[in-house]
Amino acid sequence: MQKTSFASKNTTGQMKKADVILGLQWGDEGKGKVVDVLTPRYEVVARFQGGPNAGHTLEFGGEKYILRSIPSGIFQGGKTNIIGNGVVLDAILFRAEAEELAKSGHDLTKQLCISKKAHLILPTHRMLDAAYEAAKGSAKIGTTGKGIGPTYT
């Protein structure tokens, strides 16, 4: 489940407002569309939990992008984008996503901060995910197989 929060500061540098978008269903409620509408109003866009199990499709400047890990505030110049402690990152998917954005001129080094405490999905997590799902037989839950659950445990 992807969760995103926003924050803005007043002229004295104090936090004046923070809004949080939570997915309370099964993770595919259209949070991304709400995030896209709200990001221009905030200085900080942060993902604080979730992983790359779904893609958020966006169109900016006539180009189509699919974001799985990077907050969509990256398209709003001058915004700080944060990947927080509770996020699980797949380094391979993250790198591909970052390279696509870099090709289009989005400088992640100036707009993106990643917590040192964010969790990394390893190949063993994906293998465990598949094994746990297979072991459940007809009681399986329909995991995406991306290793997100085992990374959190």
Regions found by a protein language model. Give the residues of each.
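Non-transmembrane, aqueous-exposed alpha-helical and coiled segments at domain scale
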Residues: 6-153
